Amino acid sequence: MTNTPAPRARRSVLSRGSWSETARIAGILRKETVGGAVLLVASAVALVWANSPWAESYFALRDLKIGAEPFGLHLNLTLGTWAADGLLAVFFLVVGLELKREFVAGDLRDPARAALPMAAAVGGMVVPALIFVAVTAPVGDGATRGWAIPTATDIAFAVAVLAVISTHLPAALRTFLLTLAVVDDLLAVTVIAVFYTDEINLTALGLSIVPLALFALCVQRRIRSWWLLLPLGVATWVLMHESGVHATVAGVLLGFTVPVLRSVAAGGPEAGPGLAEHFEHRLRPLSAGVAVPVFAFFAAGVAIGGVSGLTRALSDPITLGIILGLVVGKPVGIFLTTRVLTAVTRANLDDALRWIDVFGVALLAGIGFTVSLLIGDLAYGLGSDRDDFVKVGVLTGSLVAALIAAVLLRVRNRHYRAVWLQETADTDRDGVPDVYQSQRD
């Protein structure tokens, strides 16, 4: 008699990760919550000011030129451009550090765990882009150039929504949302570098490699002196800006050079965190609390022109394409990709979750703000009529996506609270919740 082998247990997707990873992500989201609140205030101030009797002073401030052109470098820029090209480089530097850490020591280092958020991010990029192109293609005259606008996720805005509705989102969903946003940022940087670069100065681009390589050499040798690293970083940014490639790409490349783990010569991973964590700890408050809100202040201000102006903006195909892309395309792309990949790999959703939870998180990912506004500026030009339509579309689409997500997640909050109580219970008071200890056992 032959023994029938026992059926293999199905793999579970969106399951709870390790305690160290969960604690790290919780810390990041706490900081992003504060940054999200500042971001919302800055955007609200810009909108009110731009539609007040003093609107001219807002636009005069945004368009005020500051800088010089030493050695022929084009650095005499408006304050709005300094915010978009300069301050956002700090944001993308943190993105680079985050990406490097995820690929080296986070969820993305494991192909099995990385496949789902990476595929979901791609799905969440393709579907809204297709919707935008379908809506704007009949217009012609370069309207489809903004196809990438509704493809981005603003994690600070998303976690601010979570804070407002006081939901206890399970650790697995928080991890999925953050990882999704990180991959989204990687895709956004790639899109900006490839599709929104018109002319390239190869000499400046080649020269930018020199300070970038010196920066990499310093951080690999664990040199932390900002007196040395800051000039090298600024030089990389200036030359990248001069090359025609969007200068925020320099931030990501600088972040990629920073080591996540300590080298053997420095004591190895057991000796403590690598330089990437140290830099991220220092730079994230600057990014979330200053760089992104200041950019939002200069980018979100749009003169709506009363009810008639709002009606005109909302009826424009560019505005409609963005709203539909964010509210419909983004969540549907993420949800369907996740559902299909789960079915194809014959996996099961974690027992603590339901598919409605995944759709709620996918709706949060439809909140596209910072990067969406940046791509709008690049696609149509800062201050143009179409750029104003982009702002109305991004603000409206993000607000609608946030409201629907808030309602959906709030309905499930009783269940989330039960999961949260289980995930935070620490009966032996050793600082590690019991569920994570049982995972190790």
Curated annotation (Swiss-Prot):
Top-level taxon of the source organism: Bacteria
Gene3D superfamilies: Na+/H+ antiporter like domain
GO cellular component: plasma membrane
Topological type in the membrane: Multi-pass membrane protein
Localization, UniProt: Cell membrane
GO molecular function terms noted in the UniProt entry: sodium:proton antiporter activity
Alphabetical keyword list: Antiport, Cell membrane, Ion transport, Membrane, Sodium, Sodium transport, Transmembrane, Transmembrane helix, Transport
Swiss-Prot/TrEMBL catalytic activity: Na(+)(in) + 2 H(+)(out) = Na(+)(out) + 2 H(+)(in)
InterPro entries xref list: Na/H_antiporter_dom_sf, NhaA
Transmembrane residue ranges: 34-54, 77-97, 115-135, 146-166, 176-196, 199-219, 225-245, 249-269, 290-310, 317-337, 355-375, 389-409
One BP annotation, GO: regulation of pH
A Pfam family it matches: Na_H_antiport_1
Family listed: Belongs to the NhaA Na(+)/H(+) (TC 2.A.33) antiporter family.
Function as written in the Swiss-Prot or TrEMBL entry: Na(+)/H(+) antiporter that extrudes sodium in exchange for external protons.
Record-linked PANTHER family: NA(+)_H(+) ANTIPORTER NHAA, SODIUM ION/PROTON ANTIPORTER NHAA-RELATED
Name of the protein in question: Na(+)/H(+) antiporter NhaA 2
